[in-house]
């Protein structure tokens, strides 16, 4: 499945995790933090493509947290062959 996360609609950490939960249909136990996101993404059993659009806006809004998100997404992608992540400015 293909999912798109629009970085221009994310203005805070809380909004980011809410958008990720809704976009990816994450489980109820999702802890709304990067460690929980990693756990969910590395546990995917079906192929998932996640495209983050307006990444520059996401970085502007979240600063260093956006960089931490990028690391989590890349690490999750390396760990789980069912996950593909792309970023678009």
What would you call each of these model-derived segments?
Residues 1-89:
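Positively charged, polar, low-complexity stretches
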């Amino acid at each position: 499945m293909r999912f798109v996360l629009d970085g221009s609609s994310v203005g805070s950490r809380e909004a980011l995790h809410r958008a990720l939960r809704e976009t990816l249909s994450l489980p109820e136990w999702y802890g709304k933090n990067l460690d929980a996101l990693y756990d969910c993404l590395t546990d995917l059993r079906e192929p998932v493509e996640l495209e983050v659009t307006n990444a520059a806006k996401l970085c502007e809004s979240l600063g260093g947290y956006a960089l931490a998100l990028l690391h989590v997404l890349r690490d999750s992608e390396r760990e789980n062959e069912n996950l593909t992540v792309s970023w678009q400015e």
